[in-house]
UniProtKB/Swiss-Prot annotation:
Leading EC class: hydrolase
Keyword Repressor: no
One Pfam family, short name: Peptidase_M20
Recorded GO MF terms: acetylornithine deacetylase activity; metal ion binding; succinyl-diaminopimelate desuccinylase activity
Organism phylogeny: Bacteria, Bacillati, Actinomycetota, Actinomycetes, Mycobacteriales
CDD domains in UniProt: M20_DapE_actinobac (cd05647)
Active-site feature positions: D79, E136 (proton acceptor)
Protein name (database record): Succinyl-diaminopimelate desuccinylase
E.C. no: 3.5.1.18
Length: 369
């Protein structure tokens, strides 16, 4: 028997300590049961009057029902990418290292702590919903937030959603959309010494490659924020042997687009710009795609957070995050958490502990009278 079993999660204590406890519970995607159990137990053991706690698969949800004028959702995923010899966690010189420290157990810890400390406070300004969900780091059809949307949509009702992805304590508003298109060229195989008997599939892609290389990406201003689009070839493959004209070539295009376009508009833009339709021997197909999320900074419920963070610390989110799911449901959504996202998924994943404290203080200021 292990005589050094750690106590359950202390949601009311220091969010830095809570972050480290969460990090030290391994939870790669698909293996979230233990961390979901501990989060659920911690919430139920608080016995907060008037607070509803609900378990759905490995998603843990909680909400207040105080009849306040507006509702803010605090959402964070509980899974991580596969562990890369970076557990257990450690803290050195004010930096916490370990799998999930930045993506996104620091943000999750802050949201759990904030919910636990304010749910029954007389100073609370907005009703709160807490969503701790599974399988964000893997295929879309496994995403816990999507399952909640499909099976229990009433739990996602809110005037504003905050997602605890790492932002360095800044507000990263909305997110860009993400589109991947596979373009395939068909030719005729032949010996390279008699190339005129064949039809080089790779050469058929070359005009499209040239158009992508010459593409001038747009910079789009929305609510005073600049979103930067990008169209790139991210994978290309062809070839049979060094003396064979290839009869097949394909490439993947990735288009990151500003949230003023929806997914269908993004597809249409790429197809028209690259003239993919009507080319002999060329076919294309959408491999994956998701629309972005508008920033929603003009909402009244958002103004207090902007004041607490500071207007000089607001920027556009260039990557795609689950705020897109909230936007699709008509809920304004912002990314707000601790840490530098460039350390996500790395062996040296890390988060400054000071930022955990700062983000918790900002959230308390925003949500309290």
């Amino acid at each position: 028997m292990n005589s050094e079993l750690k106590p359950g999660l202390d949601l009311l204590g220091d969010p830095i300590v809570l972050t480290q406890r969460l990090v030290d519970i391994p939870s790669p995607s698909g293996q979230e049961k233990q961390i979901a159990d501990e989060i659920e137990d911690a919430l139920r053991n608080l016995n907060l009057p008037g607070v509803e706690v609900f378990r759905f698969n490995n998603n843990v949800l909680a909400r207040t029902n105080r009849g306040l004028a507006s509702r803010v959702m605090l959402a964070g995923h509980i899974d991580t990418v596969p562990i890369a010899d970076n557990l257990p966690s450690r803290v050195e010189d004010g930096i916490m290292y370990g799998c999930g420290t930045v993506d996104m157990k620091s943000g999750l810890a802050v949201y759990l702590h904030t919910f636990a400390t304010l749910a029954t406070s007389t100073e609370l300004k907005h009703d709160l919903t807490l969503i701790a969900y599974e399988c964000e780091e893997v295929a879309d059809h496994l995403n816990g937030l999507g399952h909640i949307r499909d099976e229990h949509p009433e739990w996602l009702a809110a005037d504003l959603a905050l997602l605890g992805e790492p932002t360095g304590g800044w507000i990263e508003a909305g997110c860009q959309g993400n589109l991947r298109i596979k373009v395939t060229a068909h030719g005729v195989r032949a010996h390279s010494a008699r190339s005129w008997l064949g039809d080089n599939a790779m050469h058929k892609l070359s005009p499209i490659i040239s158009k992508v290389a010459a593409y001038k990406a747009a910079e789009v201003n929305i609510d005073g924020l600049t979103y930067r689009e990008g169209l790139n070839i991210v994978f290309c493959e062809s070839g049979v042997a060094n003396n064979v004209i290839p009869d097949l070539a394909w490439m993947n295009l990735n288009f990151r687009f500003a949230p003023n376009r929806d997914l269908n508009e993004a597809i249409e833009h790429v197809v028209e710009t690259l003239e993919l339709d009507g080319q002999d021997g060329i076919e294309w197909a959408v491999e994956d795609g998701a629309g972005g999320a508008l920033p929603g900074l003009g909402q009244q419920v958002t103004s207090g957070l902007i004041d607490a963070v500071g207007r000089e610390k607001i920027r556009a989110k260039f990557g795609w995050t689950d705020v897109s799911r909230f936007s699709a449901m008509g809920i304004p959504a912002l990314n707000f958490g601790a840490g530098d996202p460039s350390f996500a998924h790395k062996r040296d994943e890390q988060c400054p502990v000071e930022q955990i404290t700062d983000v918790a203080a900002i959230l308390k200021q925003y949500l309290s009278e």
